[in-house]
Amino acid sequence: MAAEAGKASEGMVDLEEPKKMTREDWRKKKELEEQRKLGNAPAEVDEEGKDINPHIPQYISSVPWYIDPSKRPTLKHQRPQEENQSKFAPIGDWYKRGVQEKSVNTKYRKGACENCGALTHKKKDCLERPRKVGAKFSGTGIAPDEHQQVQLSMDYDGKRDRWNGYDPDEHMRIVEEYSKVDLAKRTLKAQKLQEELASGKLMDQANSRKHEEAVQDHSSEDEDEDKYVDDFDMPGQNFDSKRRITVRNLRIREDIAKYLRNLDPNSAYYDPKTRAMRENPYSNTGKNPEEVGYAGDNFVRYSGDTISMAQTQLFAWEAYEKGSEVHLQADPTKLELLHQSYKVKKDDFKEKQKETILEKYGGSEHLDAPPRELLLAQTEEYVEYSRHGAVLKGQEKAVAQSKYEEDVLNNNHTCIWGSYWKDGYWGYKCCHSMVKQSYCTGEAGKKVVSNSCTPFEEDVEEAQTSEEPKTLLQMHQEKLKDKKKKKKSKKHRDSDSSDEEDEAKKKEKLKKALSAEEQRLKQVAELMQVDERKRPYNSLMEVREPTEEEMEAFRMKRCRPDDPMASFLGQ
């Protein structure tokens, strides 16, 4: 019995509490750990025969009692547990498509749909037409069971796999289709060559040199494709051989990308996200920015009102340091007016300072001296003239002249051609003539043109739009409409007069309320100056709801401390 009890105890896991270690055992354990860390003693081995790293801390390597009470050295509790891992479908599984439903059963089965007899759904989910006598009672026309698709659980990569469920056999069908098309093209070409050979055209054409080039082009693959397209329509292709449309690329090939202007990696930085190159790419090459077609995008930062806004912001900071409460975003109007007045005063101060210095020391005659070119009668500026005196090259820019003749008056005209415009045509202003190179007719021509502008069609339209005779019914309906209009206009006049009276009464009430509010504010100001102990009490016997006019007067006279312009009300 004792041996059996010992064997049973060996098979069972020791669930006793851990005994307290002695000092000697604790010292030996620590020495063994140090030896293992130094590599002088073999490392611990888990149940799978793998070495346990001795440098792993104890709080990681020790096994909780509720996971493995055997206290064996292991790291299994730190590894992912297989029973808790989610299982995903293999790569070959996918939904079956095109499964044919065949009705094999001829008898009704228990638990099937009472309407059609299929086992995959119930009567309330049946999509067939409700039968007069269901399959449960008739036993005929048993519908086939729907194919139940497999439930696939895909992992992260499987859900995003674009080739998931792809069948390579589908591509083989396309290859077979193109092979059939190629075979048909070859047979057509062979038949056509046989017909030309039988008719004798091929021998005549072979003698000429032009036909040799045509045969070479004819044998090329591109010619075969064009020939096939002319005769057939490719299955699955939307191509019309009767109208061929060629779309040209409208991009200008002469333009240069920003990042290709200077290939030096130390030159201006190109931001590919915003497609911006702020600095000048030709800065290190020594070229003048004015002579270069592109000098960077930094010029946009200084365009518009950027410089004036920066000057205003600088003025606001300087004024704030000197005690003025101004802000560019909070008080833009006030800051702008203050800045303008500062500029005017600054200019006046400079002028006065200049005048006082000239009055004190003199020398105003030197400021009014003629230019240096007139004094020395020579300059270092290069100017090139033509034989006719026109400026070709130099400081003064030559005026561009038109290639057409200007201010040419011919055929007695006093105005040039194009000085008059009417109804989409150009003409002469002097005689209103629309014919170029015509002779001027003066005021007589203007009268003729003005008289000829009265069309005959207007008289015809007026004759056509003459009033037709009206019936008695139409006349009666028009009278009723006139009466209704008169009644409406009379009511509208009465309502307008009443509205004007109401507005006048409201204005009078508002004036009275404003005067009463002013008196109340004066009384409040007087009471606030009196000592608190001497102020009278407020009686609640006369409390009533204020009228609309009194509320409006209170709002108009109320002082708002948060109003930025409140400080200017007393000025």
UniProtKB/Swiss-Prot annotation:
Its main location: nucleus. Keywords: Cytoplasm, Metal-binding, mRNA processing, mRNA splicing, Nucleus, Spliceosome, Zinc, Zinc-finger. It comes from Danio rerio (Zebrafish). Required for pre-mRNA splicing as component of the spliceosome. Participates in the second catalytic step of pre-mRNA splicing, when the free hydroxyl group of exon I attacks the 3'-splice site to generate spliced mRNA and the excised lariat intron. Required for holding exon 1 properly in the spliceosome and for correct AG identification when more than one possible AG exists in 3'-splicing site region. May be involved in the activation of proximal AG. Probably also involved in alternative splicing regulation. Residues 1-91, 199-235, 462-571 are annotated as: Disordered. This is Pre-mRNA-splicing factor SLU7. Pfam families: Slu7. Residues 220-233 have a biased composition (Acidic residues). GO terms for biological process: mRNA splicing, via spliceosome; RNA splicing. Residues 482-492 have a biased composition (Basic residues).
